[in-house]
């Protein structure tokens, strides 16, 4: 099964780059990506057109008329060409088995929902400035949770 990963974003290219790097590390690699931008920023357009990743990316935008995330998500859902959708926010770095696990539990007429782990400011900044630290993230999280 091939999913489409829809990423809802608003101007934060640093976080989107971290998401893309986490997508490059996925154990399941056959997926499409739609970046659903609630707005139309030059920085986002330049970032997406100036970088290449190992998966196809479709960038959808709309006018920045205040918070209108749901409208751009509806456009992204309509633009998808696959049978399974995974929708995430533009500040969620993914575990390397994120797509694999979604597909393992995917079934017709089923909706999967999950929660994210909200990181403190220090850990968030570390992930955004040194992406290699994500490899050690599970161990760091356990240390803080136990």
What residues fall within each predicted segment?
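Cell-envelope/extracellular polymer assembly enzymes that use nucleotide-activated donors
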Residues: 2-4, 32
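Conserved short acidic donor-positioning loop in nucleotide-sugar-dependent glycosyltransferases
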Residues: 11, 23, 37-40, 64, ...
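Short, acidic, metal-binding catalytic loop of nucleotide-sugar glycosyltransferases
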Residues: 21-30
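Short beta-strand/loop segment that forms part of the nucleotide-sugar
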Residues: 30-40, 58-62
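A conserved acidic beta->alpha catalytic loop
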Residues: 37-46, 53, 92
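Glycine-rich, basic loop-to-helix element that forms the pyrophosphate-binding segment
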Residues: 63-80, 97
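Short aromatic/hydrophobic "clamp" motif used to bind/position activated sugar donors
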Residues: 85
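Conserved donor NDP-sugar-binding/catalytic core segment of glycosyltransferases
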Residues: 97-130
């Amino acid at each position: 099964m091939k999913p489409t990963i829809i990423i809802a974003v608003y101007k934060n290219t640093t976080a989107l780059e971290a998401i893309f790097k986490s997508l490059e590390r996925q154990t399941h690699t056959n997926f499409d990506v739609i970046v659903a931008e609630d707005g139309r920023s030059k920085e986002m357009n330049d970032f997406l057109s100036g970088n290449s990743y190992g998966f196809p990316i479709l960038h959808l935008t709309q006018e920045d008329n205040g918070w209108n995330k749901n409208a751009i998500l509806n456009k992204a859902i309509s633009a998808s060409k696959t049978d399974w959708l995974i929708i995430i926010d533009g500040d969620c770095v993914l575990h390397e088995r994120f797509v694999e696990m979604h597909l393992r539990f995917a079934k017709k007429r089923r909706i999967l929902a999950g929660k994210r782990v909200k990181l403190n400011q220090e850990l968030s900044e570390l992930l955004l400035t040194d992406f290699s630290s994500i490899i050690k993230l599970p161990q760091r999280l356990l240390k803080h949770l136990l």
